[in-house]
Amino acid sequence: MPPKPTNWRMYGKMAVAGLTCCVGGPALIYYISPTEEELFLKYNPELQKRSLENRVGKQEDFDNFVARLKEYSKSDRPIWVEAEEAARKKRSGKIEEQAKLMQEMQQRKEEIKKSGTNLMPGGSL
């Protein structure tokens, strides 16, 4: 029995369909997706004003975030480990700061007690 002939018509249809899906799909999405400017113009005036006011702050936050990511990526360890360690250091720094404030408050109370000033809660000066 001779081998079956190659069905070039079927392979051609499959190639055209695959090319249409692979190229046409993203092209269609690119064509129908609105730009940031078009979305901004669809906002009501109050939202446009608020968005313009918050734009600088959001940009600064994003820049800080990217700077931190660059700093974390300098290490050999994964970024999430570095971020967790930085958060832990920040928390411990806040705890130490709170402890210092409490100690200063205690010292002030002791100074007031030693000076002999009698403070009454709710009293007038």
Curated annotation (Swiss-Prot):
Signal peptide: none annotated. Keywords: Chaperone, Coiled coil, Membrane, Mitochondrion, Mitochondrion inner membrane, Transmembrane, Transmembrane helix. It is found in: Mitochondrion inner membrane. Residues 92-119 form a coiled coil. It holds the Pfam family CBP4. PANTHER family: ASSEMBLY FACTOR CBP4. This is Assembly factor cbp4.
